[in-house]
């Protein structure tokens, strides 16, 4: 399982696989 957190265009994107 991986956790990715990145800010872009004022939007928080979180991806968990």
UniProtKB/Swiss-Prot annotation:
InterPro entries: Ig-like_dom_sf. GO terms for biological process: adaptive immune response. It is found in: Secreted; Cell membrane. Keywords: Adaptive immunity, Cell membrane, Immunity, Immunoglobulin, Membrane, Secreted. GO terms for cellular component: extracellular region; immunoglobulin complex; plasma membrane. J region of the variable domain of immunoglobulin heavy chains that participates in the antigen recognition. Immunoglobulins, also known as antibodies, are membrane-bound or secreted glycoproteins produced by B lymphocytes. In the recognition phase of humoral immunity, the membrane-bound immunoglobulins serve as receptors which, upon binding of a specific antigen, trigger the clonal expansion and differentiation of B lymphocytes into immunoglobulins-secreting plasma cells. Immunoglobulins are composed of two identical heavy chains and two identical light chains; disulfide-linked. This is Immunoglobulin heavy joining 1. It comes from Homo sapiens (Human).
